[in-house]
Amino acid sequence: MSLSAFTLFLALIGGTSGQYYDYDFPLSIYGQSSPNCAPECNCPESYPSAMYCDELKLKSVPMVPPGIKYLYLRNNQIDHIDEKAFENVTDLQWLILDHNLLENSKIKGRVFSKLKQLKKLHINHNNLTESVGPLPKSLEDLQLTHNKITKLGSFEGLVNLTFIHLQHNRLKEDAVSAAFKGLKSLEYLDLSFNQIARLPSGLPVSLLTLYLDNNKISNIPDEYFKRFNALQYLRLSHNELADSGIPGNSFNVSSLVELDLSYNKLKNIPTVNENLENYYLEVNQLEKFDIKSFCKILGPLSYSKIKHLRLDGNRISETSLPPDMYECLRVANEVTLN
């Protein structure tokens, strides 16, 4: 496999999880460019449908020839997108605009909704103050991280949208609550590093992964997570959660595999379902280990599935652990204490 092919192969792998990995290879590494390419960009002959225009100090979107499906415009100075910018590439599937100077007012008309084959749209590290749109129904992966977003438009009708990354913005709960209505395919939602003080209503029950860490959340409504029958990964670390703000069965969700409550103000270990495998509670104010937080009943077939448990940065010492702890945590590989 040529090095240029390997580069795109890595990007394709990164795309399968909804993540985008930034490989900063110089343009010369891609080899000879295909003739069907903007002169200032590079289109590897082995992957002529990909056009790389990274780090060229571009101030506008270059001419994109027909046949391009993967367009990379990272690390430029692009501050506007004209409505006809992608007129020749209606079959564009990936559009990567990370690290530019884009503002909402300078993204014209229905420039994205015209791209009926678009699956990935990444506009991370720009100057957006609200979500972009309208968007095509084909979209699967939307990334708008590291902007200044305070307002979300509705994503209703985006039936294929599976991944949404909104971390490192300025969102509050009122801006979030109505935005995700009707997203029946949404599996991954990252709202970390925002200004959310209450858990937003109206989140899709289809979610497998929900990240709300590094916000200002202090309480959890009773049975809030009960309706999320598919939820597997939940992060609420670096919030303001205390015992008084967590009803008894808040995290008794049978589908949960991983729960992160680290860096909060908890004095007692919240009760979890026996199916939970990874539980992160480091740097709280925990004073005791209550086995009933993990096992309601102990028996040959009644035990916790916990594999990794972090309790470091608390007031629990090894000598204070109950003698029957490992009868409950019998499959644990790692229990981290101070």
Swiss-Prot record:
The family database entries (PANTHER family) matched by this protein are listed as: AGAP008170-PA, LUMICAN
Q: Which SMART domains match?
A: LRR_BAC, LRR_SD22, LRR_TYP, LRRNT
Subunit structure and binding partners: Binds to laminin.
Under which name does UniProt file this protein?
A: Lumican
Q: Its gene?
A: LUM
Give the sites modified to Sulfotyrosine. Answer: 20-21, 23, 30
Q: Name one GO molecular function term.
A: extracellular matrix structural constituent
Q: Where does it mainly reside?
A: secreted
Please tell me, according to the UniProt entry, what happens when changing residue 199 to P: Found in patients with amyotrophic lateral sclerosis
Q: Phosphoserine (modified residue): where?
A: 304
Gene Ontology biological process: cartilage development; collagen fibril organization; positive regulation of transcription by RNA polymerase II; positive regulation of transforming growth factor beta1 production; response to growth factor; visual perception
